[in-house]
Curated annotation (Swiss-Prot):
Keywords: Cell projection, Membrane, Transmembrane, Transmembrane helix. It is a multi-pass membrane protein. Disulfide bonds: none annotated. Residues 298-350 are annotated as: Mediates interaction with MAP1B. This is Transmembrane protein 185A. It is found in: Cell projection, Dendrite; Membrane. InterPro entries: TM_Fragile-X-F-assoc. Belongs to the TMEM185 family. Pfam families: Tmemb_185A.
Length: 350
């Protein structure tokens, strides 16, 4: 495993999102099971931290952009800055939805359709953002997630307000369609991994990459689908599981997603105005990390020392042979000594 490559391709934005979602899901499961009696405003603390980092990072990045006009002429700088602004807009709509959810749970004074209204707005915005990101070759994960689930948001809001009385298994039909597509993606990676394993024309690095991708997708999608099935069955009253066993598959998926951020390139360089890779930024702030990052270990060090200490024997020197008549000195190389040819007397006829 190339640790240097993993940290150079580290995506801090996705790592923060997955870590906050993991901590939030743990707190939510504990709160629903009654193990902790915190307010839901405290349970949502990881979500508030996530949105706070987004707002602060975008504010600092905008300040750096405004104070340094010379940066705007650097390659894809304008594209990255606009992508950051689009992401901030989507996150603000999500923040508004989360605040309304907490207020609705704590006070219960308004309809769920009103609570879901920011998500109804974020879906068309995400569709436009997907088109813009696709044209500029940007990542689309959050935008796609918000845009394809508009029908699911509507069904959930109607079901919570008891406008429709469908079972939750039917309410989540858009979710099952999306998960079916993800299962096809997993099957695609598995088939390609098998083909690459059986092919003799593929180098080992490509085989390893495809196997890693297949295992990653399988570890993400299968537990996530398991969590959704268990949750729907609990909401419909078909099982009496507590929330912690139901959330365990979700935690496994989120941990896998956190692990995949160490091998993903990307990330907007304008968050907090750093304008460079996160790994390089850390090395500039903490120079002592360079010393530990540049250490190399030689596992054959002792053998090399023995080789250096043992003197190499010199080849034996063979004394030169003299021939008096020709006055020529012939020196033989070691291991290649050969007798001189006999003297030939050729008699000339009269």
């Amino acid at each position: 495993m190339n640790l240097r490559g993993l940290f150079q391709d580290f995506n801090p934005s996705k790592f923060l999102i997955y870590a906050c979602l993991l901590l939030f899901s743990v707190l939510l499961a504990l709160r629903l099971d009654g193990i902790i009696q915190w307010s839901y405003w405290a349970v949502f603390a990881p979500i508030w931290l996530w949105k706070l980092m987004v707002i602060v990072g975008a504010s600092v990045g905008t300040g750096v952009w405004a104070r340094n006009p010379q940066y705007r002429a650097e390659g894809e700088t304008c594209v990255e800055f606009k992508a950051m602004l689009i992401a901030v807009g989507i996150h603000l709509l999500l923040l508004m939805f989360e605040v309304l959810v907490c207020d609705r749970i704590e006070r219960g004074s308004h309809f769920w359709l009103l609570v879901f209204m920011p998500l109804f707005f974020v879906s068309p915005v995400s569709v436009a953002a997907c088109v813009w990101d696709f044209r500029h070759d940007r990542s689309l994960e959050l935008e796609i997630l918000c845009s394809v689930n508009i029908l699911q948001f509507i069904f959930i809001a109607l079901r919570l307000d008891k406008i429709i009385h469908w079972p939750w298994l039917v309410v989540c039909v858009p979710l099952w369609i999306l998960m079916s597509f993800l299962c096809l993606v997993v099957l695609y990676y598995i088939v390609w991994s098998v083909l690459f394993l059986r092919s003799m024309d593929v180098i080992a690095e490509q085989r390893r990459t495809h196997i890693t991708m297949a295992l990653s997708w399988m570890t993400i999608v299968v537990p996530l689908l398991t969590f959704e099935i268990l949750l729907v069955h609990k909401l419909d009253g078909h099982n009496a599981f507590s929330c912690i066993p139901i959330f365990v598959p979700l935690w496994l998926s989120l941990i896998t997603l956190m692990a995949t951020t160490f091998g993903q390139k990307g990330g907007n360089h304008w968050w907090f105005g750093i304008r460079k890779d996160f790994c390089q930024f850390l090395l500039e702030i903490f120079p002592f990390l360079r010393e530990y990052g540049n250490i190399s270990y030689d596992l054959h060090h002792e053998d090399n020392e023995e080789t250096e200490e043992t003197p190499v024997p010199e080849p034996p020197k063979i004394a030169p042979m003299f021939r008096k008549k020709a006055r020529v000195v012939i020196t033989q190389s070691p291991g290649k000594y050969a007798l001189p040819p006999p003297k030939l007397n050729i008699e000339m006829p009269d």
